[in-house]
A protein has these predicted regions:
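Glycoside hydrolase catalytic-domain context in secreted enzymes
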Residues: 1-307
Length: 307
C-alpha cells in the first residue's frame, strides 16, 4: 500500500521538479518520518533521484523524544540528520545541539556537510546569493497571489481529486432543463471550511462557496434555493424542518454534509469517523422526503457513512 497508494503523489511531485520536501509527524512501521532513513535517503533520494532539500515539520525533530526513539535533543538531532533531514523547523535542535553531537561522533560530520550543501544549493537555485531580498518585494504579492494561472491550476486539481462514490440511480449529471435545485446544509456556505483547517494566509473574501458557485452558474431557468438545516459544529436542530420544507419544494436536492474546519485537521480531529450527529440527523430527514438527493461530502479525512 505504501508504494502503490501513498507514495505515488510524492513521486510525481519529485518528477515535476519540486525543490523541497517536508517530513510528516507520523511514523511508518514504527519509525518516525523525521528519523526514517529508508524513506528519505533510500526511497526519496537514491531510488527517485530527488536532489532537493528536506525540512522537518514544525518541532518534529524535538518530538522524536515524544516518539520514544530519542532520550535527548542531541540524540534527536543526530537521528534526524542521519536520516537525511537538512533543516529543522522551529525546534532549534540542529542549530543548538548538533555541534556537540558531531564532537561525540565524527562520522556525523559527513551528514552535516551534506545537509549544509543541500541548503546552500537550494538558496543558489532560488537566486538568493545574488538577490537576498528577491522574495520580499511588496509588489510581488499583488501580482502573484491568486493570479488567474494559479486559480486555474487549483480548480483543475480540485476537479481531478473529486470522487464519485456511486450513481446507482443515474441522478448525475443533473439536467440543464429549468428546475428547482435545493441546496441543503450549512457547509454549502461555510467559506472557512472551504479554506481548510491549515489555511495560512487564506481569506474568506477570496473564496467562492459551493452555494455561490451554483447560484452564479445555474442554467437559465433553474432556481437555486437554500436552507442550512444544521452545521457540523452546532447542536441546534430547530432548522431541520425548514430544510425539509425547502427540499420538498425542489426537483433535486444537493445535500452538503460532513465536517467543518474545526472538526478535522492537525491536532483537532474527532476520535469518531462517523458523521457528526447533527449531519446524520439532517441527512436522514432529507432522505425521508423521497426527493432525488445528491450528497456532497465535505471533509478533510475519510468518514464512515454507515447509515
Amino acid at each position: 500500500s505504501l508504494m502503490e497508494v501513498y507514495l505515488p503523489p510524492f513521486y510525481a511531485a519529485t518528477k515535476a521538479g519540486t525543490g523541497s520536501m517536508m517530513t510528516a509527524f507520523n511514523d511508518i512501521a514504527g519509525v518516525p518520518s523525521t528519523a526514517n532513513e529508508y524513506l528519505i535517503d533510500d526511497v526519496l533520494r537514491a531510488e527517485w533521484g530527488f536532489d532537493g532539500m528536506i525540512v522537518s515539520d514544525w518541532n518534529a525533530v524535538a518530538e522524536l523524544i515524544n516518539h520514544g526513539v530519542a532520550e535527548t535533543e542531541e540524540q534527536a538531532g543526530k537521528l534526524a540528520l542521519q536520516a537525511g533531514v537538512d533543516m529543522d523547523m522551529t525546534s532549534m535542535v540542529l542549530p543548538t545541539k548538533i555541534k556537540a553531537a558531531v564532537q561525540s561522533d565524527a562520522c556525523l560530520a559527513h551528514d552535516l556537510d551534506a545537509a549544509v550543501a543541500r541548503i546552500l544549493t537550494t538558496k543558489e537555485r532560488l537566486g538568493l546569493f545574488d538577490t537576498p531580498m528577491a522574495y520580499h518585494d511588496p509588489e510581488r504579492e499583488k501580482t502573484t497571489l491568486l493570479k488567474d494561472e494559479f486559480r486555474r491550476a487549483a480548480r483543475h486539481a480540485a476537479v481531478k481529486s473529486m470522487v464519485l462514490l456511486k450513481n446507482e440511480k443515474q441522478t448525475l449529471p443533473l439536467s440543464s432543463s429549468p428546475q428547482t435545485i435545493a441546496v441543503i446544509g450549512g457547509l454549502a456556505e461555510d467559506k472557512l471550511t472551504q479554506l481548510g483547517s491549515w489555511r495560512a494566509q487564506g481569506k474568506t473574501d477570496d473564496v467562492v462557496s459551493l452555494l455561490e458557485g451554483l447560484q452564479r452558474n445555474a442554467p437559465s431557468g433553474t432556481t437555486v434555493t437554500y436552507a442550512a438545516g444544521t452545521h457540523p459544529s452546532s447542536e441546534v436542530r430547530g432548522a431541520i424542518q425548514q430544510a425539509v420544507d425547502t427540499a420538498m419544494d425542489a426537483d433535486q436536492v444537493l445535500l452538503v454534509i460532513g465536517e467543518d474546519f474545526d472538526l478535522s485537521g492537525e491536532a483537532r480531529s474527532r476520535s469518531d469517523i462517523a458523521l457528526p450527529p447533527s449531519q446524520s440527523e439532517l441527512a436522514q430527514a432529507i432522505f425521508a422526503t423521497g426527493k432525488p438527493v445528491t450528497v456532497i461530502l465535505v471533509t478533510g479525512r475519510p468518514l464512515a457513512l454507515e447509515d
